[in-house]
Amino acid sequence: MKLFIAATVLTTISFAHPALSESIAHTRQLLATKQCQSCDLSGAGLVLANLSGANLTGANLSGANLSRANLSGADLTGANLVGASLFGANLTGAKLGGAQIAGADFRDAYLYNVSFGDADVNVAHLQGAIGIPIAAGKAEDFYRWGMLQGQKGDSQG
């Protein structure tokens, strides 16, 4: 029985290791070159990273922590940002067309001149975000977001 458990653990580790090392290699590549198209960066810790102008088209950033990262001018077209934390991140001028942003946390993020394209902002957390483009939603969306802010006592006046 002990042999079976040990074999199971070793098999699990050996299968998980290549994916982990690939993710680490992609993270290093991104930080060194700011080029990481279609990379697997899922779950990556990129807090406070300077990724201005980075090319992350088609990258998998699901569950990644990009809190307070500088992504100004970054190309995130078609990226998977499902469940990613971009709390307080600077996304000024970033391209997010076709990105999957369900459950992404954009609270307190800077979104000036962001191009969301056809990304559905109604499935992301935008409370406290600054500079949300008018094209990001309908009047009803902005009203709802404002009401949520008011209920939380976050209104300025």
Q: What are these model-derived regions, one by one?
A:
Residues 6-14:
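Bacterial N-terminal signal peptides
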